[in-house]
Amino acid sequence: TDPYFDMVIDCSPDLKINGGLGSISEQLIDSGVHVALGGGMKHFTPLAEGSDQTVLELAKESGYQLVSNATELDGSGAGKLLGLFSPSTMPVMWRGQDDRAAEKPDPSFLNRIHSMLGSVTYPEPMDCESNPEYIDIPSISLMTQTALDRLTEEDERNFFLMVESASIDKQSHQRKACGSIGELKQLDESLAVAMKFAESHPDTLILVTADHGQAAQLVPERTLYSGIP
Protein backbone atom coordinates (compact mmCIF):
# COMPACT_ATOMS: atom_id res chain seq x y z
CA THR A 1 0.00 0.00 0.00
CA ASP A 2 1.35 3.41 -0.95
CA PRO A 3 1.02 5.71 2.10
CA TYR A 4 0.76 8.78 -0.12
CA PHE A 5 -1.89 7.71 -2.60
CA ASP A 6 -4.08 5.05 -0.96
CA MET A 7 -5.70 6.82 1.97
CA VAL A 8 -9.12 5.72 3.24
CA ILE A 9 -11.46 8.71 3.56
CA ASP A 10 -15.14 8.77 4.52
CA CYS A 11 -16.95 10.19 1.48
CA SER A 12 -20.47 9.19 2.52
CA PRO A 13 -21.63 12.86 2.73
CA ASP A 14 -20.82 13.14 -0.99
CA LEU A 15 -23.11 10.28 -2.04
CA LYS A 16 -25.97 11.39 -4.28
CA ILE A 17 -28.46 9.76 -1.91
CA ASN A 18 -27.15 12.08 0.83
CA GLY A 19 -27.42 15.18 -1.33
CA GLY A 20 -23.88 15.09 -2.65
CA LEU A 21 -22.58 15.14 -6.20
CA GLY A 22 -21.36 11.55 -6.26
CA SER A 23 -17.85 10.28 -6.90
CA ILE A 24 -15.39 12.36 -8.91
CA SER A 25 -15.39 9.73 -11.65
CA GLU A 26 -19.20 9.96 -11.91
CA GLN A 27 -19.04 13.76 -11.92
CA LEU A 28 -16.47 13.65 -14.70
CA ILE A 29 -18.68 11.52 -16.93
CA ASP A 30 -21.82 13.50 -16.08
CA SER A 31 -20.05 16.76 -16.98
CA GLY A 32 -19.74 15.79 -20.64
CA VAL A 33 -16.13 17.01 -20.76
CA HIS A 34 -14.74 16.37 -24.24
CA VAL A 35 -11.32 14.92 -23.34
CA ALA A 36 -10.01 13.41 -20.09
CA LEU A 37 -6.65 11.62 -20.01
CA GLY A 38 -4.67 10.27 -17.05
CA GLY A 39 -4.55 7.52 -14.45
CA GLY A 40 -7.15 6.24 -11.99
CA MET A 41 -8.83 3.35 -13.82
CA LYS A 42 -9.75 1.75 -10.47
CA HIS A 43 -12.13 4.63 -9.75
CA PHE A 44 -14.15 3.91 -12.89
CA THR A 45 -14.61 0.14 -12.45
CA PRO A 46 -16.99 0.12 -9.41
CA LEU A 47 -20.73 0.26 -9.97
CA ALA A 48 -22.06 3.78 -10.26
CA GLU A 49 -24.22 4.81 -7.32
CA GLY A 50 -27.76 3.46 -7.71
CA SER A 51 -26.88 1.63 -10.93
CA ASP A 52 -26.10 -1.91 -12.06
CA GLN A 53 -23.47 -0.53 -14.45
CA THR A 54 -19.92 0.57 -13.76
CA VAL A 55 -18.88 4.17 -14.26
CA LEU A 56 -16.82 2.96 -17.22
CA GLU A 57 -19.87 1.37 -18.84
CA LEU A 58 -21.83 4.57 -18.34
CA ALA A 59 -18.98 6.48 -19.97
CA LYS A 60 -19.21 4.28 -23.06
CA GLU A 61 -22.99 4.77 -23.14
CA SER A 62 -22.40 8.52 -23.01
CA GLY A 63 -20.35 8.35 -26.19
CA TYR A 64 -16.81 8.21 -24.84
CA GLN A 65 -14.16 6.27 -26.70
CA LEU A 66 -11.99 4.47 -24.13
CA VAL A 67 -8.24 4.01 -24.57
CA SER A 68 -5.82 2.45 -22.09
CA ASN A 69 -2.30 2.80 -23.53
CA ALA A 70 -0.18 5.01 -25.76
CA THR A 71 -0.73 2.86 -28.84
CA GLU A 72 -4.51 3.10 -28.54
CA LEU A 73 -4.32 6.84 -27.84
CA ASP A 74 -2.17 7.48 -30.89
CA GLY A 75 -4.67 5.63 -33.08
CA SER A 76 -7.87 6.96 -31.52
CA GLY A 77 -10.62 8.42 -33.69
CA ALA A 78 -12.78 11.51 -33.44
CA GLY A 79 -15.30 12.32 -30.71
CA LYS A 80 -15.27 12.34 -26.92
CA LEU A 81 -12.25 10.59 -25.44
CA LEU A 82 -11.53 8.99 -22.05
CA GLY A 83 -8.00 7.70 -21.54
CA LEU A 84 -7.18 5.74 -18.36
CA PHE A 85 -3.61 4.49 -18.48
CA SER A 86 -3.02 2.95 -15.04
CA PRO A 87 -5.05 1.72 -12.05
CA SER A 88 -3.94 4.68 -9.93
CA THR A 89 -1.17 7.26 -10.41
CA MET A 90 0.56 6.89 -13.78
CA PRO A 91 4.13 5.51 -13.76
CA VAL A 92 6.80 8.18 -14.11
CA MET A 93 9.29 8.27 -16.98
CA TRP A 94 12.49 8.26 -14.91
CA ARG A 95 13.61 6.79 -11.61
CA GLY A 96 16.78 6.84 -9.54
CA GLN A 97 19.45 4.23 -10.26
CA ASP A 98 18.11 0.89 -8.98
CA ASP A 99 15.04 2.84 -7.85
CA ARG A 100 17.04 4.83 -5.31
CA ALA A 101 15.47 7.75 -3.50
CA ALA A 102 17.38 10.59 -1.86
CA GLU A 103 19.14 9.34 1.27
CA LYS A 104 19.90 11.06 4.54
CA PRO A 105 23.42 12.17 5.52
CA ASP A 106 25.01 10.02 8.24
CA PRO A 107 26.51 12.22 10.99
CA SER A 108 29.11 10.81 13.35
CA PHE A 109 28.46 10.56 17.08
CA LEU A 110 30.39 13.80 17.76
CA ASN A 111 28.58 15.63 14.98
CA ARG A 112 25.27 14.69 16.55
CA ILE A 113 26.45 16.43 19.71
CA HIS A 114 27.52 19.59 17.87
CA SER A 115 27.57 20.48 14.19
CA MET A 116 31.17 21.76 14.46
CA LEU A 117 32.45 18.43 15.77
CA GLY A 118 33.11 15.11 14.06
CA SER A 119 32.17 14.44 10.47
CA VAL A 120 29.23 13.72 8.19
CA THR A 121 29.12 11.01 5.52
CA TYR A 122 27.02 12.13 2.58
CA PRO A 123 25.17 9.85 0.14
CA GLU A 124 26.82 8.90 -3.12
CA PRO A 125 25.47 10.73 -6.18
CA MET A 126 23.09 8.72 -8.35
CA ASP A 127 22.24 8.60 -12.01
CA CYS A 128 18.71 8.67 -13.38
CA GLU A 129 17.48 5.79 -15.51
CA SER A 130 14.37 4.85 -17.47
CA ASN A 131 11.56 3.47 -15.34
CA PRO A 132 10.89 -0.15 -16.41
CA GLU A 133 7.21 0.32 -15.49
CA TYR A 134 6.90 3.10 -18.08
CA ILE A 135 5.73 0.78 -20.88
CA ASP A 136 3.23 1.95 -23.51
CA ILE A 137 2.40 4.88 -21.25
CA PRO A 138 1.56 8.05 -23.21
CA SER A 139 3.82 11.02 -22.62
CA ILE A 140 2.28 14.25 -21.41
CA SER A 141 3.22 15.82 -24.74
CA LEU A 142 1.30 13.11 -26.65
CA MET A 143 -1.73 13.61 -24.39
CA THR A 144 -1.48 17.38 -24.91
CA GLN A 145 -1.27 17.04 -28.70
CA THR A 146 -4.18 14.57 -28.74
CA ALA A 147 -6.32 16.87 -26.61
CA LEU A 148 -5.57 19.88 -28.83
CA ASP A 149 -6.44 17.86 -31.93
CA ARG A 150 -9.75 16.75 -30.41
CA LEU A 151 -10.71 20.17 -29.14
CA THR A 152 -10.16 21.76 -32.55
CA GLU A 153 -12.03 19.14 -34.59
CA GLU A 154 -14.82 21.65 -35.12
CA ASP A 155 -14.06 25.05 -36.61
CA GLU A 156 -14.28 28.05 -34.27
CA ARG A 157 -14.47 25.84 -31.17
CA ASN A 158 -13.48 27.71 -28.02
CA PHE A 159 -11.99 25.52 -25.33
CA PHE A 160 -10.15 25.35 -22.02
CA LEU A 161 -7.42 22.73 -21.58
CA MET A 162 -5.63 22.02 -18.30
CA VAL A 163 -2.42 19.99 -18.39
CA GLU A 164 -0.78 18.92 -15.14
CA SER A 165 2.41 17.01 -14.41
CA ALA A 166 1.23 15.97 -10.95
CA SER A 167 4.07 13.59 -10.13
CA ILE A 168 6.59 16.42 -9.95
CA ASP A 169 5.04 16.90 -6.52
CA LYS A 170 4.24 13.27 -5.72
CA GLN A 171 7.77 12.06 -6.43
CA SER A 172 9.21 14.89 -4.33
CA HIS A 173 7.14 13.72 -1.36
CA GLN A 174 8.98 10.40 -1.60
CA ARG A 175 12.40 12.06 -2.07
CA LYS A 176 12.61 10.62 -5.60
CA ALA A 177 14.46 13.39 -7.38
CA CYS A 178 14.86 11.56 -10.70
CA GLY A 179 11.14 10.88 -10.92
CA SER A 180 10.38 14.52 -10.21
CA ILE A 181 12.95 15.81 -12.72
CA GLY A 182 11.67 13.47 -15.42
CA GLU A 183 8.12 14.72 -14.96
CA LEU A 184 9.34 18.32 -15.08
CA LYS A 185 10.99 17.45 -18.41
CA GLN A 186 7.67 16.02 -19.60
CA LEU A 187 5.88 19.23 -18.64
CA ASP A 188 8.44 21.27 -20.57
CA GLU A 189 7.90 19.09 -23.65
CA SER A 190 4.12 19.46 -23.40
CA LEU A 191 4.53 23.23 -23.13
CA ALA A 192 6.48 23.15 -26.39
CA VAL A 193 3.51 21.39 -28.02
CA ALA A 194 1.14 24.07 -26.70
CA MET A 195 3.44 26.89 -27.83
CA LYS A 196 3.60 25.42 -31.34
CA PHE A 197 -0.20 25.27 -31.39
CA ALA A 198 -0.36 28.91 -30.31
CA GLU A 199 1.86 29.94 -33.24
CA SER A 200 -0.90 28.98 -35.65
CA HIS A 201 -3.69 30.05 -33.28
CA PRO A 202 -2.61 33.54 -32.14
CA ASP A 203 -5.71 34.04 -30.00
CA THR A 204 -4.49 31.29 -27.63
CA LEU A 205 -3.66 32.20 -24.03
CA ILE A 206 -1.17 29.91 -22.25
CA LEU A 207 -0.63 30.18 -18.50
CA VAL A 208 2.09 28.18 -16.72
CA THR A 209 2.12 28.08 -12.94
CA ALA A 210 2.65 25.91 -9.87
CA ASP A 211 0.28 25.49 -6.94
CA HIS A 212 3.11 25.28 -4.38
CA GLY A 213 6.82 24.67 -3.96
CA GLN A 214 8.54 21.57 -2.62
CA ALA A 215 11.21 21.15 0.03
CA ALA A 216 12.95 18.70 -2.31
CA GLN A 217 13.60 21.62 -4.65
CA LEU A 218 15.52 23.63 -2.04
CA VAL A 219 19.29 23.34 -2.47
CA PRO A 220 22.15 24.95 -0.53
CA GLU A 221 23.85 27.99 -2.01
CA ARG A 222 27.17 26.14 -2.04
CA THR A 223 26.38 22.61 -3.17
CA LEU A 224 28.27 19.69 -1.67
CA TYR A 225 28.59 18.10 -5.09
CA SER A 226 29.89 21.06 -7.11
CA GLY A 227 32.98 19.11 -8.24
CA ILE A 228 30.98 16.32 -9.86
CA PRO A 229 30.55 16.68 -13.65
In which residue ranges do the predicted regions lie?
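A post-motif C-terminal structural segment
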Residues: 2-229
